[in-house]
Amino acid sequence: MDTNKAKKLKVMNQLVEGHDLTTQLQQLLSQPGSGLEDLVAKILVCFNNTISVLDTFEPISSSSSLAAVEGSQNASCDNDGKFEDSGDSRKRLGPVKGKRGCYKRKKRSETCTIESTILEDAFSWRKYGQKEILNAKFPRSYFRCTHKYTQGCKATKQVQKVELEPKMFSITYIGNHTCNTNAETPKSKTCDHHDEIFMDSEDHKSPSLSTSMKEEDNPHRHHGSSTENDLSLVWPEMVFEEDYHHQASYVNGKTSTSIDVLGSQDLMVFGGGGDFEFSENEHFSIFSSCSNLS
């Protein structure tokens, strides 16, 4: 170590001398005259001596250089990235958080932005958010792939209207789809024909009609249940209730073409063997669905 200190002192002296000689050269250049060549030669000798001294320095061990580098990182990255001393080297125990002075590059997903008048594409999306954007006229909507939780697809997209052309949408796709697009999207149970009729007349719904339809959907229904008895109650309630806007009439001795599809056995369910006629075609759909329940 003493040898290195002596060499360091010699290098400093040579550099100071070279600096002084260069200053003198600058002064001589401003005055045309003699002594320039000798001064330049001295400067060259001074720098050559400095270089030769630097070449004789002992090489720094790799462990020392590693400790110096990690020490500088520890000083700039705070104490969140903990180190353990082990002789001349230090081992990192945990990851360094991305704080000031520690630049941690984050991997970003692939993005693609297009402008289109059509929002639909070949994939299935579900909207999960919307927010107002600063200095923007229109809000931005956020969508995720429908199969995010079923197939782990992380693809998302952002949709926002173009200010200068409100009919156009700026669509940004983030990430690639990893889902199987051929897989069926989970759908809610579709209502059968009876449920649709029941919902269409929701304002005028009948408790008896609701009961009969629930029994139709029950897979554990026993044979010989009281469905026919319920339908016998539904029939007069549907036809003769004043709250309904449909007009129905009971006619004896006359056959209606709209009721021909009902057999004699179906008519027995409703407690009558006569013929019926309806003023509107939509009555037929209601009564035919009720006959199918029997």
UniProtKB/Swiss-Prot annotation:
It holds the Pfam family WRKY. This is Probable WRKY transcription factor 70. InterPro entries: WRKY_dom, WRKY_dom_sf, WRKY_plant. Residues 72-94, 201-229 are annotated as: Disordered. Interacts with WRKY30. Binds to BZR2/BES1 to cooperatively regulate the expression of target genes. Binds to unmodified (i.e. not sumoylated) NPR1. Disruption phenotype: Slightly reduced in size. In wrky70-1 mutant, not alteration of responses to both JA and SA. Activation of jasmonic acid (JA)-responsive genes in a COI1-dependent manner. Enhanced disease susceptibility to the necrotrophic bacterial pathogen E.carotovora subsp. carotovora SCC3193. Impaired resistance to the salicylic acid (SA)-monitored fungal pathogen E.cichoracearum. Enhanced JA-induced accumulation of anthocyanins. Compromised basal defense and reduced RPP4-dependent late up-regulation (LURP) of resistance genes (e.g. CML10/CaBP22 and LURP1) upon infection by H.parasitica. It is found in: Nucleus. Expressed in leaves and flowers. GO terms for biological process: brassinosteroid mediated signaling pathway; camalexin biosynthetic process; cellular response to hypoxia; defense response to bacterium; defense response to fungus; defense response to oomycetes; ethylene-activated signaling pathway; floral organ senescence.
